[in-house]
Amino acid sequence: MKTFVAKPAEVKRDWFVVDAEGKTLGRLATEIALRLRGKHKAEYTPHVDTGDYIIVINAEKITVTGNKAKGKIYYHHTGFIGGIKAISFEDLIKRAPERVIEKAVKGMLPRGPLGRAMYRKLKVYAGTEHQHSAQQPQVLDI
């Protein structure tokens, strides 16, 4: 018996919509990353992007456990000397709630061109409205 290897042209990708309201950030992000990679499919191939498209709504209503709302700090650097910036989870969820889920999922995907292709299939929206109704996404209960 030969090992099955998926071909990029033959991969069937579905669209799923996930409601983040009341969900824990890390638990939701791991499930999303798994589905973006395609590891839930029998035809998973490590060097081929076999994952599905994921739409996340209600990103502003995601929760974290413990004292992480105040204690979790997100860092980025501007590129200039002394240009390190920090923002807490609490402030980032007010300013850009989509970025919280995007950063969590991006850290769980592989680095490189394949990981960037997987990340592009993630669509995150702060509210309940999204612009992908033409793709007829299925509701994914996580």
From Swiss-Prot:
HAMAP family: Ribosomal_uL13. Part of the 50S ribosomal subunit. This is Large ribosomal subunit protein uL13. InterPro entries: Ribosomal_uL13, Ribosomal_uL13_bac-type, Ribosomal_uL13_CS, Ribosomal_uL13_sf. Gene3D superfamilies: Ribosomal protein L13. Keywords: Ribonucleoprotein, Ribosomal protein. It comes from the Bacteria. GO terms for biological process: negative regulation of translation; translation. NCBIfam families: rplM_bact. PROSITE patterns: RIBOSOMAL_L13 (PS00783). GO terms for molecular function: mRNA binding; structural constituent of ribosome. GO terms for cellular component: cytosolic large ribosomal subunit. It holds the Pfam family Ribosomal_L13. Belongs to the universal ribosomal protein uL13 family. This protein is one of the early assembly proteins of the 50S ribosomal subunit, although it is not seen to bind rRNA by itself. It is important during the early stages of 50S assembly. The gene is rplM.
